């Protein structure tokens, strides 16, 4: 009798309405908090060059040993970042990553940040090792795919301060040679006065 009573319970519940909820619930997903630690992103400068300089500090800071970086030197013919070096190989193993954010704190150029995207489930273990192409931020309007020369500023200081080349309008200060150039001239005058006083 025991086996037949089990079949009876199964037969009764077969036609009941299911209470299982699908995941994710379409239209009911809550927005993630802005400071949530999701997947990583390699950022770009406004002209499209990569911010990563291949210093490997993120890999050294990672407690799970999930990051692999291989740096290389930029050349005048092939420039991927504004500095001397760039990250030629950049991989994050999400099977090991604990999303702690220590790599973000270690990055000196703010090249590495974390997004709110956390849905990275997949059926293959190999797909959890994200490469540089998958981690790089998409090109926005006005950006150019590297390699290419620096498009901002006359020298490295101007580039990292976001100043345009001489003769071009600075979107922050107005017409050419008014804001940023005037500021540079003031700095030079102050420096010359200090040198004369010494």
From Swiss-Prot:
It is found in: Cell membrane. [4Fe-4S] cluster 2 binds at residues 62, 97, 100, 103. Its main location: membrane. It comes from Cutibacterium acnes (strain DSM 16379 / KPA171202). [4Fe-4S] cluster 1 binds at residues 52, 55, 58, 107. Belongs to the complex I 23 kDa subunit family. The lineage of its organism: Bacteria, Bacillati, Actinomycetota, Actinomycetes, Propionibacteriales. Residues 42-72, 88-117 form the 4Fe-4S ferredoxin-type domain. One of its GO terms (molecular function) is iron ion binding. Pfam families: Fer4_7. SUPFAM superfamilies: 4Fe-4S ferredoxins. This is NADH-quinone oxidoreductase subunit I.
């Amino acid at each position: 009798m025991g086996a037949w009573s089990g079949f009876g319970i199964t037969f009764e519940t077969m036609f009941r309405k299911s209470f299982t909820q699908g995941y994710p619930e379409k239209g009911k997903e809550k927005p993630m908090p802005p400071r949530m630690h999701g997947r990583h992103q390699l950022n770009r400068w406004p002209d499209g060059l990569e911010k990563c300089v291949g210093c490997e500090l993120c890999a050294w800071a990672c407690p799970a040993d999930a990051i692999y970086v291989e740096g290389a030197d930029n050349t005048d013919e092939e420039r991927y970042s504004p500095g001397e070096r760039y990250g030629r190989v950049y991989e994050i193993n999400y099977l090991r990553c604990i999303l702690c954010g220590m790599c973000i704190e270690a990055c000196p150029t703010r090249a590495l940040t974390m997004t709110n995207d956390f849905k990275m489930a997949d059926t293959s273990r190999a797909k959890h090792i994200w490469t540089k192409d998958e981690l790089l931020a998409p090109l926005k309007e006005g950006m150019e795919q590297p390699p290419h020369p620096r498009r901002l500023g006359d020298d490295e200081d101007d580039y990292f301060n976001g100043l345009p080349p001489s003769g071009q309008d600075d979107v922050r200060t107005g017409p050419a040679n008014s804001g940023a150039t005037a500021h540079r001239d003031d700095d030079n005058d102050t420096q010359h006065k200090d040198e004369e006083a010494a």
